[in-house]
From Swiss-Prot:
Name under which the protein is recorded: Required for excision 1-B domain-containing protein
Gene: Rex1bd
One Pfam match: DNA_repr_REX1B
Highest taxon listed in the record's lineage: Eukaryota
Organism: Mus musculus
Amino acid sequence: MLTAATEVLAAADGPGSAESAWAWRDAPIATLVQRIQQLQNERAQAFRRLDQAHRQYLLSGQHYDFPSYRSVVHEVTQAFAAASREVLAVEAELAGPRAQPVLARHVRSLQELEQTRLATVALLQVMGTPGVSEQDPEKLHQLKIKVIKTMEAIGEVLQELRFDAESAE
């Protein structure tokens, strides 16, 4: 379990560099913002898949099916890493060639919030697994609240990004 959670966290920390033949380089700002929204939708699907896999893992009973869970964690990690690489490429495009520092800051904030969300969800999963760590109901509740507040902040940043992008065009 700890290995799987660590792999998920690594996706948020080390996305690597964007490819030089990035498909969105000449796209209008509105298209870049739409792509960010698509990437957010992909992240949301990955979070749902991670949650579902963790629930299945917990339901597998005494003989926890860790290999299946680890496999899903690996796939989800790849999805998070790919989304992070592309989000960072959009940020670089906005900060550099497009000279849109406000939009770039929104994208950077979004990336940082997603890293926080991912780390918190991974910790929640570790803490919620019987036998892996001592369950502390108050700490679990605090982490759940942190995930909710982080998701609200992500929604606010996306709204600001859309609004400021309309003004930039």
